[in-house]
């Protein structure tokens, strides 16, 4: 679980052992971690977690210890920095064990760390521009990646890197001013 701490405030990561909650605040480096947004569990190792930070980049946690903070310095510049901080909106593992990353307000806003430990990314700026990427949803059936933005649009990327932009208000009876989340109907109805 995460103690949400917006606006550049430090935040704690807690783990539960079945009886007690333990903070990672006593772990070296924890006191510099800010603006945690979400955590994803490695499907191949439940004690291996990745967290997205709207300040630091991608935080790697293993056996309740922070073991790495990924940013432009250790990802071959795949994770890019907005002028004053990293803006990682979401991290998720796909069915193949690749870590997918939504990196907001940069040229390559959709990044990945594949299961071979290779970094890569897809250009999103021509679609998204300076609009913030607010979140990411992975389609479990057709493997589309959906990134929703602060300008009320949804960028859809397929496995070949092809992209389309969806406007949720085209054809909608009730217009929306902002996409807050995207979920998938798992039984296809």
Task: Identify the function of each model-found stretch.
Residues 1-189:
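Carboxylate-rich, polar loop motifs that coordinate divalent cations or form catalytic acidic clusters
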